[in-house]
């Protein structure tokens, strides 16, 4: 009985990972995170007013979600500004810090 190598399943795993990734991206793009207001016939996700014979619905529009959407938020309160500031501080401390290696006291550039 000759020895044969085991079958190569890399293409199967790659196809499965690609399919799961594509399904996850599509699900994230099409899902709705808006608050559900109304019933199955009268949906008011962005706010509004509806009235028929026995029913009346008034719903204000959703508020601001976070500091990015706020109009009067301070610049350093913005999440992107904090990230940029931290990146600049790390870069500056690397450039302006000790030029020598702490392990061997040599200069590695």
From Swiss-Prot:
The keyword Methyltransferase does not apply. Pfam families: Plant_vir_prot (PF01307). Residues 31-72 are lumenal. It comes from the Viruses. InterPro entries: Plant_vir_prot. It is found in: Host endoplasmic reticulum membrane. Residues 1-9, 94-109 are cytoplasmic. Keywords: Host endoplasmic reticulum, Host membrane, Membrane, Transmembrane, Transmembrane helix, Transport, Viral movement protein. One of its GO terms (cellular component) is host cell endoplasmic reticulum membrane. The chain crosses the membrane at residues 10-30, 73-93. GO terms for biological process: transport of virus in host, cell to cell. Plays a role in viral cell-to-cell propagation, by facilitating genome transport to neighboring plant cells through plasmosdesmata,. TGBp1, TGBp2 and TGBp3 seem to act together for cell-to-cell propagation. TGBp1 is the main movement protein that physically cross the plasmodesma with the viral genome. TGBp2 and TGBp3 would facilitate TGBp1 function. Belongs to the Tymovirales TGBp2 protein family. This is Movement protein TGB2. It comes from Potato virus M (strain Russian) (PVM). The lineage of its organism: Viruses, Riboviria, Orthornavirae, Kitrinoviricota, Alsuviricetes.
């Amino acid at each position: 009985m000759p020895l044969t190598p085991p079958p190569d399943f890399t293409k199967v795993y790659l196809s499965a990972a690609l399919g799961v990734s594509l399904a996850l991206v599509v699900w994230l793009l099409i899902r709705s995170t808006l608050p559900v207001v109304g019933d199955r016939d009268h949906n008011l996700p962005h706010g509004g007013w509806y009235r028929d014979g026995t029913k009346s619905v008034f719903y204000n529009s959703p508020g601001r979600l976070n500091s990015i959407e706020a109009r009067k938020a301070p610049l350093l309160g913005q999440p992107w500004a904090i990230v940029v500031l931290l990146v600049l501080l790390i870069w500056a401390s690397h450039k302006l810090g000790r030029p020598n290696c702490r392990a061997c006291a040599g200069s590695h550039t």
